[in-house]
């Protein structure tokens, strides 16, 4: 099990769908090769992990790294409830699975766009980026991630 880290009312909630294999082994989200890249991403927008609430919807990785439709509905409910409890100022949706669960849209459709995520306590502005592991495997996607991340600094 990989539990959330951080405090309520953080500047940013970083939300993945579920832990990666390295995360489950280490008991912390965004470890392994993806960890240093996430740290660099946060530094680029003026934050560090301690400024953020970092969580995943599922505390364990599903078999095969995918969930079925029946689980997706429950994870969507958990998403909105978790965001309402965490009360972040902004939300960073990490990975195509997370975005699909949150909005039903593919990552390509929302790159460089500010999203509004409705939840039990209102709504929060969000952006989506590819998972850092994907950005390491496909560096050409880093520019699109940066286009989205710049929106988080808007109005700061």
Q: What is the predicted role of each segment?
A:
Residues 1-156:
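A polyanion-binding, active-site-adjacent surface
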């Amino acid at each position: 099990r990989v539990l959330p880290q951080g405090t309520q009312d953080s500047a940013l909630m970083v939300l993945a769908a579920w832990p990666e294999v390295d995360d489950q082994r280490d008991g912390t989200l965004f470890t392994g090769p993806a960890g240093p890249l996430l740290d660099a991403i946060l530094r680029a927008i003026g934050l560090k992990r301690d400024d953020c609430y970092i969580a995943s919807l599922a505390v364990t990785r599903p078999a095969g790294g995918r969930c079925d439709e029946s689980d997706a509905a429950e994870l969507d409910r958990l998403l909105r409830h978790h965001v309402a409890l965490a009360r972040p100022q902004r939300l960073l949706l990490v990975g195509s699975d997370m975005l699909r669960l949150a909005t039903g849209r593919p990552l390509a459709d929302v790159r460089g766009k500010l999203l509004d995520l409705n939840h039990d306590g209102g709504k929060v502005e969000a952006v989506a980026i590819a998972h850092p592991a994907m950005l390491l495997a496909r560096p050409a996607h880093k520019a699109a991630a940066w286009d989205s991340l710049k929106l988080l600094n808007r109005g700061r």
